[in-house]
């Protein structure tokens, strides 16, 4: 049967959020890559002629079935590069004349820890700080510290509110010690919007010798992915699959079932595409009509 439509394949770089220093080096080399693969493709306009996006990944949540159909809601995040300015002094002769940037940083991070009781469970807040620099020599009061921060939460409102708390922690610690704070906002990801299993995908998976379950509104993934950016612009038909063992991003990760990890996901993509585009793309057009960009 003829199909009404076309399919584009993207070899997209992994969604992993690379550090600010590496992004700065890439920019100097003329490589855009502001945060991750799909975000960059959006920036370049590569999806401008697309109507529906299909994505797939190994299971990101505990799932016993072979396939998980639909998009569970996921956190989004904001990020900053924070530079703490202090004042250098000899660490033994006159430390009282210095302003310790590392102490400011440590105090701010401790304050964030004490703030955790203010985070609502339904907001799924996660805070991350990585100290990239905290002084240069051991016998001098550190006059500069550089930290990359990340705030994860389930909604933009929760992200903004938590980011304000994090900023106040740094500002308050700097004020207490007599230092200053500089901030560079970094690109983050939008939260993933929940989408249930589309009929075309559920009908397709039934043709495979595989177990499955469909996403529910209560399902939530605390991680973040650049698919979140796509879900605000396009209907994203997603599924995840098993066939592996070990931890995601762990040294023990390995494929255990090549049929389930490679062959069946490819078949599910092909079968779903067929059902979207057959019969004058009836199902694809219905999905597009019902989708409202956010």
Outline where the language-model segments fall.
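Histidine/acidic-residue-rich, glycine-tolerant segments that coordinate divalent metal ions
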Residues: 3-128, 135-140
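Metal-dependent amide/peptide-bond hydrolase catalytic core
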Residues: 106-294
């Amino acid at each position: 049967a003829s199909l009404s439509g076309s399919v584009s394949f993207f070899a997209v770089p992994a969604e992993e959020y690379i550090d600010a220093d590496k992004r700065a080096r890439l920019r100097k080399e003329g490589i855009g890559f502001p945060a991750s693969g799909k975000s960059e493709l959006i920036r370049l306009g590569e999806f401008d002629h697309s109507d529906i996006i299909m994505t797939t990944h190994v299971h990101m949540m505990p799932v016993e079935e072979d396939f998980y159909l639909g998009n569970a809601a996921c956190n989004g995040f904001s990020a900053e590069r924070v530079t703490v300015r202090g004042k250098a002094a000899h660490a033994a002769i006159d430390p009282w004349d210095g302003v310790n940037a590392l102490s400011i940083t440590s105090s701010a991070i401790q304050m964030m820890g004490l703030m955790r009781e203010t985070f609502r469970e339904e907001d799924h807040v996660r805070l991350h700080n990585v100290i990239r620099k905290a002084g240069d020599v051991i016998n001098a009061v550190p006059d500069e510290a550089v930290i990359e921060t990340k705030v994860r939460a389930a909604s933009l409102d929760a992200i903004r509110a938590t980011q304000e708390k994090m900023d106040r922690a740094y500002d308050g610690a700097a004020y207490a010690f007599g230092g200053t704070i500089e901030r560079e906002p970094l690109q983050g990801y939008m939260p993933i919007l929940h989408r249930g299993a589309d009929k075309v995908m559920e009908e397709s998976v039934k043709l495979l010798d595989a177990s499955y379950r469909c996403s529910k509104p209560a399902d939530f993934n605390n991680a973040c992915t650049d698919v979140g950016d796509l879900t605000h612009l396009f209907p994203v038909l997603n599924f995840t699959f098993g066939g592996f063992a070990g931890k995601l991003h762990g040294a023990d990760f390995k494929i255990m079932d090549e049929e389930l990890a490679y062959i069946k996901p490819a078949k599910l993509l092909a079968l779903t595409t067929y059902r979207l585009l057959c019969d004058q793309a009836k199902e694809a057009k219905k999905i597009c009509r019902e989708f409202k960009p956010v």
